[in-house]
Swiss-Prot record:
Localisation: Cytoplasm
Highest taxon of source: Bacteria
Catalytic activity: (6R)-5,10-methylene-5,6,7,8-tetrahydrofolate + glycine + H2O = (6S)-5,6,7,8-tetrahydrofolate + L-serine
Requisite cofactors: pyridoxal 5'-phosphate
Class of this enzyme: transferase
Residues the record lists as binding (6S)-5,6,7,8-tetrahydrofolate: L117, G121, H122, L123, S349, P350, F351
Pathway terms, separated by semicolons: One-carbon metabolism; tetrahydrofolate interconversion; Amino-acid biosynthesis; glycine biosynthesis; glycine from L-serine: step 1/1
Oligomer and partners: Homodimer.
Organism taxonomic ancestry: Bacteria, Bacillati, Bacillota, Bacilli, Bacillales
Protein name per UniProt: Serine hydroxymethyltransferase
């Protein structure tokens, strides 16, 4: 960043501080990851200069012959990665991918069945503060109070009762596998479209470690970061028959020009995900997640559902008389980054919460194995059981620094 350092030291300094934070902290936010240097290079390329409204071979601007190559690579790699007939890599985010699907097949006021946000769903699955809840009549399904897992009989009952035009499966804070085949059966029974939002688990799906929703869903949406370890962005996968409608829904429906530098980075990330090393990485994610859950529970920390099948876990803080807001702050002070999170049947406000969400995708990228992640679990539990003990917190902070120093991040930057 030689030019930036010379021209705009304020921005340069802020970026360097953020790099220092990422290096020094144990990153456990489930929606975050560390992209490769080559993904960052693509993001910072001259492709950021190019307007390319439309699609490869059908642009509204001249001079698109080379960005066409990049977008075709991204689409082809995405289709290969997930076994899809159609891919649209232009959505700027997962939220816009979801919006485009809704825009393509729903009318304002249509009924949609989606997962309750506090039970693990997402804002774009019908939250009243989100466009989805404003434009469409969302009705909810959730998890059982005893198991904290999805009960497909209850989902079916809700579908039969409300007769939705679409069912949305997928979650932002659900630690167990989702059975997309069962969702397909329910959707077929009521004549509904099925959209799966696999944003959090896309990398695990690509690695064959979670059921692939593409064969079951009419529409599959995802972000391209999180476990897929690409740039921040979105994508839609579907059968070829939906190409024209979905393409129009993205452009000119809800977006203008695509971000060609981001699409290039998506292509690079998809190429990485097609390599055997990526499967090895995702297998380590699962091992780390299970080890973290096991370690926390061994130290009297309540993990919802008793464990995890993916990259994340939810910790219930009520037995410790703590709030997510307080724990997030104290953990951050000792160098462990998490986010406060609502838990099913929440009694606190979304700004306070009774839980935290913890994910291992980023630290696994960094090289953490089961031995390292067990240390992380011990550190978290020590904080939770000694949240006002300054001596313990200082000791944890020092051990966090020792651990992160053992796993250097971006040494060439």
């Amino acid at each position: 960043m030689v030019y930036l350092q010379k021209q705009d030291k304020e921005v340069f300094d802020a970026i360097k501080l953020e790099l220092g934070r990422q290096r020094a902290n144990i990153e456990l936010i489930a929606s975050e990851n560390f992209v490769s240097e080559q993904v960052m290079e693509a993001m910072g390329s001259v492709l950021t200069n190019k307007y390319a409204e439309g699609y490869p071979g059908k642009r509204y601007y001249g001079g698109c012959e080379f960005v066409d190559i990049v977008e075709d690579l991204a689409r082809d790699r995405a289709k290969k990665l997930f076994g899809a007939e159609y891919a649209n890599v232009q959505p700027h985010s997962g939220a816009q991918a979801n919006m485009a699907v809704y825009h393509a097949v729903l009318e304002p006021g249509d009924t949609v069945l989606g997962m309750n946000l506090s039970h693990g769903g997402h804002l774009t699955h019908g939250s009243p503060v989100n466009f989805s809840g404003v434009l469409y009549n969302f009705v909810e399904y959730g998890v059982r109070e005893d198991t904290k897992e999805i009960d497909y009989d209850i989902v079916r009952e809700a579908a039969l009762k409300h007769k939705p035009k679409m069912i949305v499966a997928g979650a932002s804070a659900y630690p167990r596998k989702i059975d997309f085949a069962k969702f397909r059966e329910i959707a077929d029974e009521v004549g509904a479209y099925l959209m799966v939002d696999m944003a959090h688990i896309a990398g695990l799906v690509a690695a064959g470690l979670h059921q692939n929703p593409v064969p079951y869903a009419d529409f599959t949406t995802t972000t391209t970061h999180k476990t897929l370890r690409g740039p921040r962005g979105g994508m839609i996968l579907a059968k070829a028959e939906w190409e024209q409608k979905l393409n129009k829904s993205i452009f000119p429906g809800i977006q203008g020009g695509p971000l060609m530098h981001v699409i290039a980075a998506k292509a690079v990330a998809f190429g990485e995900a097609l390599q055997p090393e990526f499967t090895t990485y995702c297998e380590q994610i699962i091992r780390n997640s299970k080890k973290l859950a096991e370690t926390l529970q061994a130290h009297d920390v309540t993990v919802l559902t008793g464990g995890s099948d993916n990259h994340l876990l939810l910790i219930d803080l009520k037995p410790l008389s703590l709030t997510g807001k307080a724990v997030e702050k104290v953990l951050d002070e000792v160098g462990i980054t998490v986010n406060k999170n609502t838990i099913p049947f929440e009694t606190e406000s979304p700004f306070v919460t009774s839980g935290i969400r913890v994910g291992v995708a980023a630290v696994t990228t960094r090289g953490f194995d089961e031995v390292a992640i067990e240390k992380v679990g011990v550190l978290i539990s020590e904080v939770l059981h000694n949240i006002e003990n300054e001596e313990v917190l200082a000791d944890v902070k020092a051990r966090v620094a020792t651990l992160t120093n053992e796993y250097p991040l971006y040494p060439s930057l």
